[in-house]
Curated annotation (Swiss-Prot):
Source organism, top-level taxon: Bacteria
Similarity field: Belongs to the EcpR/MatA family.
Domain HTH luxR-type: 122-180
Signal peptide (residue range): none
Compartments reported by the entry: Cytoplasm
Pfam assignment, any one: GerE
Keywords: Activator, Cytoplasm, DNA-binding, Transcription, Transcription regulation
Cited CDD domains: LuxR_C_like
Full protein name: HTH-type transcriptional regulator EcpR
GO biological process, one term: regulation of DNA-templated transcription
SMART domains: HTH_LUXR (SM00421)
């Protein structure tokens, strides 16, 4: 994903036409539920699709995309496997909120809730990835082996595997599948 060319877009990734069209229509549909004008939303907000296809890029280059959206109101749209990562970025960055996409959830109400600025830490529904787990996920995404990670993090290989296993439980998936 090229962040410089996306910085004028309010929905990332813009090349995902189904997500772009669907979210655009959802925002228009909830116009009566939100306090801001559609033009202000288009100008001030960035909606980011955290799905399994794009997760590797967001993990490996999180400092880049976070700096690219600085000054914008960032809303993360999180699939089930990316909820813990979305919570991590919410806690550790200037993210406005997270919309959890699930079968039993009303996405319209959740989207309006976040846009209106009502999303709070108490609304976090799942565990979040810890800082150490995130470091290990990043290094794994860069292709590093557990032994190298242990040497860099000054811990045992067993500790690296434990953090990976804990992160995988929170992400409902093996890390290597997410970062392919």
């Amino acid at each position: 994903m090229e962040y410089k060319s996306c910085s004028d877009k309010y929905i990332w990734s813009a090349d995902d036409s189904y997500f772009y069209k669907g979210l655009s229509e959802l925002i228009v549909d909830i116009d009566e539920l939100i306090y801001l004008s559609l033009e202000k939303i288009r100008k001030d907000f960035v909606f980011i699709n955290l799905n399994t296809a794009s997760l590797n890029e967001f993990i490996r280059r999180d400092s880049e995309w976070l700096s690219a959206v600085k000054g914008k109101q960032v809303v993360l749209i999180a699939a089930r496997k990316s909820e813990a990562l979305a919570n991590y970025w919410y806690y550790n960055s200037d993210i406005r909120g997270v919309v959890y996409v699930g079968l039993s959830r009303d996405i319209r109400k959740e989207l309006a809730y976040v846009i209106n600025g009502r999303f709070l830490r108490k609304d976090i529904k799942k565990d979040k990835i810890t800082d150490r787990e995130m470091k290990i996920i990043r290094m794994t995404a860069q292709g590093m082996q557990p032994k190298s990670i242990a040497r860099i993090e000054n811990c045992s290989v067993k500790t690296v595997y434990t953090h990976r296993r804990n992160a995988e439980a929170k992400l409902y998936s093996k890390i290597y599948k997410l970062v392919q």
